[in-house]
Design a protein with these regions (language model features):
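Membrane-interface helix-loop-helix junctions at transmembrane boundaries of multi-pass membrane enzymes
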Residues: 43-57, 82-112, 161-172
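Periplasmic/ER-lumenal interhelical loops and adjacent helix-loop junctions
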Residues: 1-82, 86
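Hydrophobic alpha-helical membrane-interfacial segments at the cytosolic entry of transmembrane helices
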Residues: 1-8, 12, 102-104, 168-177
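Hydrophobic alpha-helical membrane-insertion segments
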Residues: 16-35, 96-110, 172-177
């Protein structure tokens, strides 16, 4: 399980993002939020029965695949809608580069949940075997998604009529997000 010149595969993939946890890009706290104890959440404890307080003190707010987290990776529904709309209305190669970087970062963040892909990168991509927290690669998606969303906004500002001409694509973007 040890890589030739790097870290142990289990160690590399310990902080893997869950496949279903990817929904946190769209919906915050899909997997419960941070790893902090449930009693630290005023909203959760608002209607809690005090007789179960010892149980609440042992429960974390997070139930995803990682050993723990300070909170989800969240981009937002509106930004994701603009990202998807940007895939339809932004012209040029930058759109495809941003989409590829986004998809690649999401797939790599899955780590142990997508081992054939992860093993390929560990074995053949220089320095990847020394990468400790694979979920942190989502910072790329957190950059590329808003960037394409901003390019979509620029297109809309430059050509306001595009929304009426491409109304079905606008509806599709809303529907997908």
């Amino acid at each position: 399980n040890q890589t030739a010149n790097g870290l142990d595969r289990d160690y590399i993939t310990q902080w893997s993002y869950g496949i279903d946890e990817t929904w946190t890009l769209l919906v915050p706290n899909t997997k419960g939020g941070a790893s902090a104890p449930l009693v630290n959440s005023d909203k959760a404890m608002e209607h809690a029965d005090n007789q179960f307080m010892p149980v609440y003190q042992q429960l974390g707010q997070y139930w995803g695949d990682q050993p723990g987290t300070m909170g989800p990776v969240y981009v937002g529904a509106f930004v994701l809608m603009l990202f998807v709309l940007g895939l339809f209305i932004v012209k040029g190669g930058i759109k495809w580069a941003l989409l590829a970087a986004t998809v690649l970062s999401i797939l790599l963040s899955w780590g142990k949940n997508f081992m054939p892909f992860t093993n390929f990168f560990i074995d053949y991509v220089p320095m990847y075997a020394k990468f400790r927290t694979v979920a942190s690669i989502l910072v790329i998606a957190e950059f590329t998604i808003p960037l394409l969303a901003m390019l979509a906004l620029k297109k809309i500002v430059d050509d306001p009529g595009i929304l009426t001409r491409k109304i079905k694509l606008v509806y599709l973007s809303f529907g997908l997000t």
